[in-house]
Amino acid sequence: MKTMFLLALLAFTATSAVAQLYTTCSQGYGQCQQQPQPQPQPQPQMNTCAAFLQQCSQTPHVQTQMWQASGCQLVRQQCCQPLAQISEQARCQAVCSVAQIIMRQQQGQSFGQPQQQVPVEIMRMVLQTLPLMCRVNIPQYCTTTPCSTITPAIYSIPMTATCAGGAC
């Protein structure tokens, strides 16, 4: 329970920082240029969602082994609760993160490598399974927009601002 609270607090803090940066820069307080930092490993709850889909999903091509029902229920709760508490835009990015984690695990890639386009089969499975299992709404544009073009949210690369003239 403490872990869930800490994860929720971390997600809230990250969302607030990104929103504050966006608001400050978009209102014209200086000329801000956003620079991506090196790609971090995905947030723990997205790893949990990937594990949940791979281990507990009823989808045969994803399932590696069935966990005990109680184990799946706990992992489902750890995945779905934070997912339900974020914006739809952030959910779309979270779906992309989960799909990328699954793709990298299947291909044996590490998280420091450049991002590749997620195969259609993996993206379709995540888009069909995760919203149903977590009972959350995923925006329609997530089904047609490539992950590489979706605006970064709390589960993606954090952005820092470099402001010209010391203002921002």
Swiss-Prot record:
Pfam families: Gliadin. Keywords: Disulfide bond, Seed storage protein, Signal, Storage protein. Transmembrane segments: none annotated. Residues 1-19 form the signal peptide. SUPFAM superfamilies: Bifunctional inhibitor/lipid-transfer protein/seed storage 2S albumin. The keyword Disulfide bond applies. CDD domains: AAI_SS. Contains 7 disulfide bonds. GO terms for molecular function: nutrient reservoir activity. The keyword RNA-binding does not apply. Belongs to the prolamin family. Encoded by chromosome 7D. Seed storage protein. Not integrated in the gluten polymer through disulfide bonds, unless incorporated by reduction and reoxidation during dough making. Increases dough strength and bread volume, but decreases dough stability when added into a base wheat flour. This is Avenin-like a1. The lineage of its organism: Eukaryota, Viridiplantae, Streptophyta, Embryophyta, Tracheophyta.
